[in-house]
């Protein structure tokens, strides 16, 4: 069994807010496999800092709108407009 990461994210919500972008579309834009995107979304894998910035750039939002660490708060889904 894979241990979940402490990093949480809003990738799925952001994908749906961006014309229902697929995991494959995001993976292609970031340069990783769809399986990597799935693992990050399910919080089974923490992306590198570089990959985290690339993901945030795809959505046009700051890094902390996508990822949070314990003690941080992730903005509500409606806040990233």
Where are these regions (language model features)?
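Short basic helix-loop element that most often maps to the first helix and adjoining turn
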Residues: 10-29
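Key DNA-contacting residues within the recognition helix of helix-turn-helix
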Residues: 12, 38-39, 67
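DNA major-groove recognition helix of helix-turn-helix
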Residues: 15, 41, 70
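DNA major-groove recognition helix of helix-turn-helix/homeodomain DNA-binding modules
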Residues: 50-65
């Amino acid at each position: 069994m894979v241990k979940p990461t402490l990093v949480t994210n809003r990738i799925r919500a952001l994908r749906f807010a961006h014309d229902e972008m697929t995991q494959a579309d995001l993976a292609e834009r970031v340069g990783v496999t769809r399986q990597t995107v799935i693992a990050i979304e399910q919080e089974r894998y923490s992306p590198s800092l570089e990959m985290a910035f690339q993901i945030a750039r795809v959505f046009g939002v700051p890094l902390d709108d996508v990822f949070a660490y314990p003690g941080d708060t992730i903005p509500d889904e409606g806040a990233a407009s």
